[in-house]
From Swiss-Prot:
Keywords: ATP-binding, Cytoplasm, Fatty acid metabolism, Ligase, Lipid metabolism, Nucleotide-binding. Disulfide bonds: none annotated. Belongs to the ATP-dependent AMP-binding enzyme family. GO terms for molecular function: acetoacetate-CoA ligase activity; ATP binding. InterPro entries: Acac_CoA_synth, ACAS_N, AMP-bd_C_sf, AMP-binding_CS, AMP-dep_synth/lig_dom, ANL_N_sf. Its EC number is 6.2.1.16. One of its GO terms (biological process) is fatty acid metabolic process. One of its GO terms (cellular component) is cytosol. It catalyses: acetoacetate + ATP + CoA = acetoacetyl-CoA + AMP + diphosphate. Activates acetoacetate to acetoacetyl-CoA. This is Acetoacetyl-CoA synthetase.
């Protein structure tokens, strides 16, 4: 049998792990019935609804605008100009006026818990009701306005995943300021590579965090970050681990503690009123960052309306999320899954914020939270599930998990054996939804779906409105074969533009260079023609993504090549048969210097301090040469192919093609 035949046979034998309850009317069913009624259609199932949603995408988004109950002060004149394609970055819902924060804070069940906040090593769980959340956001916003923050200004968070982070973001959004965040595990270089491009007026941070049983002081890093941001007007420090009295911020210019900052927003003893600037649908909400593969990270600007409506399709339709849900996603505040999670509060659901290691003080820390708080939807990383499996953990024997109906996974492809592990040792009737998308769209192209079965090893379905295909190198759609993940039609949550990209050339190069007019996402995938499910096959570019921590090789180069001992370096991913990724760093030594354990330690320490522990390569090896193109570009992708045992046929583009042979059959890279 041919390889292709074996592949197709394997696809046809996909194993069902979960079936939707045919007796349960989901919000997806309600939406499909509404579309049929309003438009005189007879869409019988999810596949027919999906096909309609991508063919008639303006009608789909218009129907969902009404179905979702989006709050607006002025409705739209036009959903989208149909004559414009995805590469034209068309404006959505032209003429409408709304506010993202107003949509998240619209629920009037004042005493209902909006946010829970749990932290590593802390027994007490903080709680904030919807009424308290509105009050706190109003106070944050008043203080921001008092210091001069206005529509379009940038507000930055160098913060953990906690209540104050959510409140500060919503306050910025209520004004029309643009929020941008990195997590505390980023080093000074990593933060300045991002924030120096957008020049925030205000930065909020904490004095220290707890991770993996250790306290990590944050103030020295913050001090260096502040020095690198000349346009910064104010620094607000939130006491997080230590009480205010034990924190010295005297060395940080223009700094004050949170309570002092919020006090400036009060008028006498009165709490300020919550005000929402009414802004165009395309008004900027977030600046997110690319990994920085080819230089400084690209700054992706995401709109308030686009982020809101795309996230709501995923929460309301694909997840059937309601106000009775309690949702937790294990994420930092700098990862797009945080932004995705926070939008869910618009459904009236309660959110659980967790800061710390998911494995400390015990491997059961997240399962303990599920039972303690009645979590219904738990989001995590594929690697975490694999670790629990390797450790032999069986939560079904130790925990009730009665409330849990959905487990979501992202960050890296979910291995087929992880499906078996979840259904055998965690919960047999849970929806296991592997999701995939990216920072580029601040959302998912595909993922969980309450209307279709879960098949082992597959993402359930392409999301509504997402015209996704797998294309071969000739630009032809393929089924049952690996191909480049592409998107053919506009979507509301694609970036409106890149910051500091006036003519849009960086934007066009990032997504449309490979297939003109078609979004190429940089992932390889395979679409099952029988089930409609998708198997992700890893990155197709030079981005590094070990354990779901996405970053670019240039971030490593900037640090390593500052060492006098190193003349050049190359950083590439290596994949094992299960799709797990690790980072390999090759060093070319400068003349008269030797490769040594002492040098390795200093390099690892430097990467850990400047970026984070999660950026440290799994292996650092010596090499005698590094391949370059004739035009002088370092060639990572070719080395990635060689260490995977593949041939590099087009050697004519290399200035030193013989260097590729140095990376073949390296002993340290075998048996991964």
């Amino acid at each position: 049998m041919s390889d292709k035949g074996e592949l197709m046979e394997e696809i046809m034998e996909a194993k069902v792990m979960w079936y939707p309850d045919s007796k349960k009317i989901t919000q997806m069913d309600q939406f499909r019935n509404r579309v049929n009624r309003n438009l005189g259609l007879r869409l019988a199932n999810y596949n027919e609804l999906y096909q309609w949603s991508v063919e008639f995408y303006p009608e789909f988004w218009a129907e969902f605008w009404d179905f979702s109950g989006i709050v607006y002060s002025k409705t739209y004149d036009e959903v989208i100009d149909r004559s414009k394609g995805i590469a034209d970055v068309p404006e959505w819902f032209k003429g409408s006026r709304l506010n993202y924060a107003e949509n998240l804070l619209k629920h009037k069940e004042n005493d209902k818990i909006a946010l829970y906040s749990a932290r590593e090593g802390k027994e007490n769980i903080e709680k904030v009701t919807f009424a308290e959340l509105r009050r706190d956001v109003a106070l944050f916003a008043a203080a921001m306005r008092k210091m001069g923050i206005k529509t379009g200004d940038r507000v930055a968070g160098y913060l953990p995943n906690c209540i104050q982070t959510v409140e500060a973001m919503l306050a910025a959004a209520s004004i029309g300021a643009i929020w941008s965040a990195t997590s505390p595990d980023f080093g000074v270089n990593g933060v300045l590579d991002r924030f120096s491009q957008i020049q925030p007026k205000l930065i909020l941070s904490v004095e220290s965090v707890i991770y993996n049983g250790k306290e990590h002081c944050h103030l020295e890093k913050l001090q260096h970050v502040v020095k690198g941001l000349p346009d910064l007007k104010k620094v607000v420090v939130i006491p997080y681990v230590l009480p205010k009295e034990k924190i010295d911020i005297s060395k940080i210019p223009n700094s004050m503690f949170l309570d002092e900052f919020l006090a400036t927003g009060k008028v006498g003893d009165q709490s300020p009123q919550l005000e929402f600037e009414q802004l165009p649908f395309n008004h900027p909400l977030y600046i997110m960052y690319s990994s920085g593969t080819t230089g400084a990270p690209k700054c992706m600007v995401h709109s308030a309306g686009g982020t809101l409506i795309k996230h709501l399709t995923e929460h309301i339709l694909h997840g059937s999320t309601t106000s009775s849900d309690v949702i937790m996603y294990y994420t930092t505040a700098g990862w797009m899954m945080w932004n995705w999670l926070i939008t869910a509060v618009a459904t009236g659901a309660s959110l659980v914020l967790y800061d710390g290691s998911p494995l400390v003080p015990s491997l059961n820390v997240l399962w303990d939270l599920v039972d303690r708080l009645g979590i219904t939807i738990l989001g995590t990383g594929a690697k975490w599930l694999a670790v629990l499996e390797d450790k032999g953990l069986k939560p079904c024997n130790t925990h009730s998990l009665q409330t849990l109906h959905t487990i979501l996974s992202t960050g890296s492809p979910l291995k087929p054996q992880s499906y078996e592990y979840v259904y055998k040792h965690i919960k047999s009737n849970v929806l296991l939804g592997s999701v995939s998308g990216g920072t580029d769209i601040i959302a998912c192209f595909m993922g969980q779906n309450v209307s279709v079965p879960v098949y082992k090893g597959e993402i359930q379905a392409r999301h509504l409105g997402m015209a996704i295909e797998a294309w071969n190198e000739e630009g032809e759609a393929v089924l049952g074969e690996s191909g480049e993940l592409v998107c053919l039609k506009p979507l509301p949550s694609q970036p409106t533009h890149f910051w500091n990209d006036e003519n849009g050339s960086k934007y066009q190069k990032a997504y449309f260079a490979k297939f003109p007019g078609v979004w190429a996402h940089g992932d390889y995938c395979k679409i099952n023609p029988k089930t409609g499910g998708i198997v992700m096959l890893g990155r197709s570019d030079g981005t590094l993504n070990p354990n779901g921590v996405r970053f670019g090789s240039s971030e490593i180069y900037n640090i390593v090549e500052a060492f006098v001992e190193v003349s050049d370096s190359l950083c590439v991913p290596q994949y094992n048969k299960d799709g797990d990724e690790r980072v390999i760093l090759f060093l070319k030594m400068a003349d008269k210097f030797e490769f040594s354990k002492e040098l390795l330690k200093r390099i690892k320490d430097a990467i850990r301090v400047a970026l984070s522990a999660r950026h440290v390569p799994a292996l650092i090896l010596e090499t005698k040469d590094i391949p370059y193109t004739i035009s002088g570009k370092k060639v990572e992708v070719a080395v990635k192919q060689v260490i995977a045992g593949k041939e590099v046929p087009h050697r004519g583009a290399f200035s030193n093609p013989q260097s590729l042979d140095l990376y073949r059959n390296i002993p340290e890279l075998q048996n991964f």
